[in-house]
Amino acid sequence: MYMAIEHAQMRATLQARMGQGERERRDLRDVRERLLQVLEHGRIVIALQPIVRLADGVVVGHEALARFPLEYDLSTGRWFEDAARTGLSVELELAAAAAALARFASLPPETFLSVNVSPETACSDRLRQLIAGHDLRRLVLEVTEHTPVDDYGRLNQRLSALQEEGVRIAVDDTGAGFASLRHVLRLAPDIIKLDITLVREVDQRPRMQTLIAALLTFAQGTGADLIAEGVESPRQLETLKQLGVP
C-alpha cells in the first residue's frame, strides 16, 4: 500500500511539473507574440531626456529612452528582459535605436544623441548599417551592463572601429557594481555615466562624494567625460559642482 501511495505521489509531482513546463512554454509564446506585434507595427516611442552641462546649464545632448504601449502596463526594463528571454534582444534594441535616430535631424546641431545598446547589439553589423548616413560625431552609443560580455576582445574591436568613425562610447551605471567598473576598465569609454544611486545621495553621504571624486579623477586621467545621471535637487547639483563634475 505504501508503495502504491508513493507511486501516486510521484505521478502527481511529475504531472505538476509537466503542467508547469507547458504553462511556461505557453507564456513564452505569448510574450514573443507581444514583442513581435510591437516590432511589426513600430509601436516604440522615444522620449528625449536632456543632458545638461552643470557649469552653465546648457543642454549638450539628449538620451533616447524607449517607451512602449501603455495598455500592457509593463516597465521599459521588463520589455527588454522579455526580449532577452525570447531571443529578440537585438531586434528590439535596433528598433528602439531606429526610432531614436528618426529624431536625430530635429535636434539642435550642437547637441549629441545618446542611444542605449547591449554588448551583443554593439557587435552587430546591423547596427553599423543602421547608423550609416548619420553624423556619427554627434552620436553616443551607451553600452549597458545588463548582459555579460563573453568576449571583450571582439567587443573592443567593434567599438574601436566605431570610435574611429567618430562615434563616442559611453558606459552606463558606473559605480553600481563590479560589472560596470569592469566595463570602464576594459572598454576605454569616451563618457563615463555615474549610476543614479550615487547621485541620489551625493549631498547626504560623504562616502558617495569620495567615490564620485575618485571616478572623476579616473575620468580626467583617461580623457573621458563624466556625466551625473538623475540630478533632481539643487543640493545635489551644488554638491556635484563642488566636486568638479562638469
What are these regions, as identified by a protein language model?
Residues 58-61, 88-157, 230:
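Catalytic core of bacterial c-di-GMP phosphodiesterases, primarily the EAL and HD-GYP domains
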Residues 6-7, 13, 20, 24-27, ...:
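Signal-transducing coiled-coil linker
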Residues 130-202, 218-246:
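The catalytic core of metal-dependent phosphodiesterases that act on cyclic dinucleotides
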Residues 24, 28-32, 93, 127, ...:
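The cytosolic transmitter module of two-component sensor histidine kinases
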Residues 77-81, 90, 160:
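Conserved long alpha-helical elements within nucleotide-processing catalytic cores of c-di-GMP signaling
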Residues 24-82, 171:
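Active-site core of bacterial EAL-family cyclic-dinucleotide phosphodiesterase domains
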Residues 1-14, 82-86:
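Signal-transmission/dimerization alpha-helices at domain junctions
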Residues 13-24, 78, 82, 99, ...:
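Cyclic nucleotide signaling catalytic output domains
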